[in-house]
Design a protein with these regions (language model features):
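Oligomerization/assembly interface segments of phage tail-like spikes and tubes
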Residues: 64-80, 88, 127-141
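Short, well-structured hydrophobic secondary-structure segments
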Residues: 40-47, 72-83
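Peripheral, non-catalytic regulatory segments
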Residues: 144-146
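Short, conserved, surface-exposed binding loops centered on an aromatic residue
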Residues: 35-37, 62-66, 90
Length: 154
């Protein structure tokens, strides 16, 4: 299953950054610096945009398994923003990334990635250019229904 806390842990594993540089994107997201002169690192934002089922659920015993496509967005602001955005476009070729997603029963979609730029405000200072990458992954939800399957009546 892929949700926001799991996505954060995957990104933490991939990038190995301090917690302050990995932030969820919210509607009022600006460059999350306290000091506008803090150019030490590149800020990474993340947000799950949508979750969409694409086939019917399958029942295995008392468990229902539903395949889901999860669309999410990564944003990068700082000195390495473009470089980090470009690396996301190659994630399927990195075994560490593949393993990080596999550990949570997820897989990056190869053809569903777009990188683009977007200007964001910097709290009254000059705007910054943000690199944005939209991508998706396949995952599944497993639910224990506590019900005996209808086709297995005894």
């Amino acid at each position: 299953m892929l949700n926001a806390p799991i996505l954060r842990s995957i990104l933490k594993e991939i990038y190995g950054v301090e917690d302050k540089y990995l932030v969820p994107i919210s509607t009022n997201w600006f460059i999350p610096t306290v000091d506008p002169n803090d150019h030490v690192g590149t800020w990474i934002g993340y947000r799950i945009i949508s979750k969409r089922p694409y086939v019917r659920a399958a029942q295995f015993g008392k468990d229902m398994v539903k395949p889901i496509k999860v669309q999410f967005r990564l944003t990068f602001v700082g000195p390495q923003a473009e470089e980090l955005a470009d690396q996301v476009l190659l994630w399927e070729d990195r075994t560490d990334v593949v393993r990080a997603f596999e550990a949570h029963k997820a897989q990056i979609n190869y053809t569903d990635r777009t990188a683009f730029t977007y200007p964001i405000r910097n709290g009254g200072y000059n705007d910054e250019m943000c690199w944005v990458v939209d991508l998706s992954a396949q995952t599944s939800y497993e639910v224990d229904t506590k019900q005996v399957p209808w086709f297995n009546k005894e």
